[in-house]
Amino acid sequence: MADDKSLLARFYHADRALTAVASELDSFDGRAEPVRCTRLVGRLRQGQDRVLAITNQIMDELLGDDRAPRAFRAKFPEEVLQESLAGQLWFGAECLAAGSSIMNREVESGVMRPLAKAVTKSLDNVRNLLREQCLRNNTPNSLTLRLDINDAATEQLYESLKIFDRLFAEFELLYVSAMVQVKSKQEYEMQELICVLFSETLQRALKIGLLEQEQVDSYDPALMFSIPRLAIVAGLVIFKDGPLNMDQPADNISEMFRPFRKLLIKMRDLLRTLTKHELYQLEKLLCTNEEISLKEELICDANENDSSDVLPQEDHVVIVTTNVNTSNNSDNSDSRVDDSPNDELRHESETRDNRNSSFYSNRIIDSNRLHADVEDDVSENDDDDDPSNVLKDSLVTTDCASGYLIPNTNFGNLLQTNEAPLTDSFIATDEELKLGTSSNARIEQILSETNQKLADSGLGTANPSVDNSPELDTERPITSRSACESSEEGEIDEYDNEEDDEDSDNNLSNQQLMDPGSSAGTSQSAGKPYRTHKQQHHHRHRRSSGSIMSATSSRKYNSKHHKASASASVIVPSNQGTSSKTYSNCDTSPSSGNQSECSSTSSTTGESSQDVAMAIRAAGRIKFKTTENLLHRLFVCIAGVADQLQTNFAADLRQMLKSVFIINSSPPEPEEPPELAPTSSDKPKEPDPTDLFEFRASEQDVITPGQNSGGSSQSIYSAEEVNPEDPHDSVFGSPGTSPIRASSAPRTMMTTAESGGVTVNVSVSVVTGGGSSSSRNVQERSVSLSETSIVVENNGGATDSNLRDSHRRHSAIGSKGEYGRSRSSPNSPVNGTSAEERRMPEAPPRWIPDGDAPRCMACASSFTPFRRRHHCRNCGGVFCGVCSSASAPLPKYGLTKAVRVCRDCYVREVGT
């Protein structure tokens, strides 16, 4: 009967309808009647889909676990896995078996043709056996198959289904692989690693306060853009050995990021030059698109174990300010600027750490290797300014207008705001570096005297072996220089920097960038004017886990003809725990009257090669006027790459993010046992009316620097309530903390932080109503970042009771990322203290999953690789691009900007 719902009955009727369509299609010439042929082919395809769908259900019930595995479908694009896939495969198999070939796939068609014939033959056999079972063992409206297991026909059907299932699976893999590009096993594993990177990035973002757990639990669509952007940053500078390791061959990089390899390498080099604060600003910008502001103070948790999140083994920051005055003087008597009159080499060294740090630089000059090593111990008793001086090598250019290559000069140019080219500053290229002519014997004599006096002063020298080289095997951004070097021809031999091909765009290969731990010396010829320079460094060390060193260096060269000056500052990372500061002062006067003076400051580390490489890459920042410009450029590049993935690998990204959301969602809360009815003696305490609502600051509640708090009737309920849509808010703060605005008294919320004990002093000014124009109370509390509580209280008179009602206490115990985080969101309730009643935003509708909507919910068109799914933000339905082309703001959900909505919702929302 036609209304029989059993599997065998449904198969019987579907097979009869398919046979009728196939017979009609064979009864006429399709070329004579193309319209009729096209219509019948469409009906044939639909009939094949129905027959194979019912056959699959029968195989699931009869074969069970004996079905052929189809794990290879994980390599298929999502667009291929549709309900009509089986029908397309059957149609393709019949075409191949009939002698047709896939366009531009003749070779693959010839390989698949025997398998296609076997598939069609096996399918015909299965259809015949199933028709027999329909007539013999069908039970009307039965939910399961009731076949006689002792019947030979049943056993034959079972074996035929197994053969067909195996052949059809093999043909599916070959046919789909020939029609579309499928992932290889290696690519599939790479994308799994990228999925792991996404998950670790999300966990890190939740930990440092960039994202909130509520967004993950609610499957916030904005995370589909934020997570890939943050993953690019994390994969380049934090999880360096992960899938975004650009040092590995291009074949080992996923196809998702392989087209952007060169761009990613440049981005990696720039990201490594950022400080922890700047990196946090960039990540915050990638999440919120808010304005960049680097002028705010950071509140950092000293106990945070995320030092590897920005730059591994980096806890010190050296701020270097360099002032250079260069001149050329023909008068030898004026070149002496040091106070020391003797010709002896003097060293003043103080011990700051028990660890010794040795640096050397080697150089081949006329087949002779010259080296000078310095090993200083610095005292830990002196934290104030110390003179520092060390003589290593001085590279003087023939034209002083081109500048001198001296330590840290490339760093001084990183953040300079002038438009002057490098040659007009004080970085010289290899071709511009030249020395006066001098004999090798003279150089060796100077070096021997220097080394002898170094040994006499108790300073050790190290052999310049390759094993002790501070350069990395894979990344050598600098070339060390020997002390007081020269050649007979007056030329300096060039060493090419060993860098990746992609790094050559930064012009680092043509710049001789000096190690921060190296120093400068001078080499004069007998027939040229003597050149001297003097450096003075002042260091101040503040003892903290994230200590900041400041240094000022000045070099003066007296001249009648040339004079140049440059000033800049840079932040150079150093290593805590293994770092030691080296200060030395040396004056050298050879017997011939050549005079050279130099003082330098070096920040050395036990494992400084990696830090030096990171610092040298900072030369890429030289093309950016300000740090904001650098962060903006990085934002554009990172967002461009991440957003391009949304187009090129939309299905893969959706699958990855779905897995990430499932993994990182909060576990469901256990059901609480039913509470016992309260007895007369144990009456429930009446709740405080103010505890029924959680007030959040709105735009009118947050006091900005431009507002006048004199007649304001609003109050700030918590210092951590900051509206994210306030245009005055800027992206500032630190990992684990969110920004707290600082404005002028008496309405300021001031924060101070001390690393070490990590004590935060919070000053909150509360402005009360009732016509009072002055702040009632400012209370300071010292709290720990690990257990933060911000309390606003009032001890005034008239408004004491009112303000006590609005007393709120927010605690973030055990969560470093909770302190100061902005909790306001588009869906959070707003403060209702104004005279006008405010409506709380509604919760947005839950999106219908893609798998539950095979067709457009408006026009009922099936989705294809070209007809994509789109969700309406108002009703959550799934529509095609035509039916969801409208956009409108949805203020009831807190969405003030226009978002995608379907046509019906657009008419309804705009009409209302």
From Swiss-Prot:
Keyword annotations of the record: Metal-binding, Zinc, Zinc-finger
PROSITE patterns documented for this protein: ZF_FYVE
Keyword Oxidoreductase found: no
Ranges of compositional bias, category Polar residues: 455-468, 545-556, 572-590, 705-717, 735-745, 780-801, 822-834
Binding, Zn(2+) 1: C856, C859, C880, C883
Signal peptide coordinates: none
Bias-annotated ranges (Acidic residues): 486-505
Entry superkingdom: Eukaryota
ZnF segments: FYVE-type: 850-910
Function according to Swiss-Prot or TrEMBL: Negative regulator of epidermal growth factor receptor (EGFR) signaling.
Family: Belongs to the lst-2 family.
Entry protein name: Lateral signaling target protein 2 homolog
Organism name: Aedes aegypti (Yellowfever mosquito)
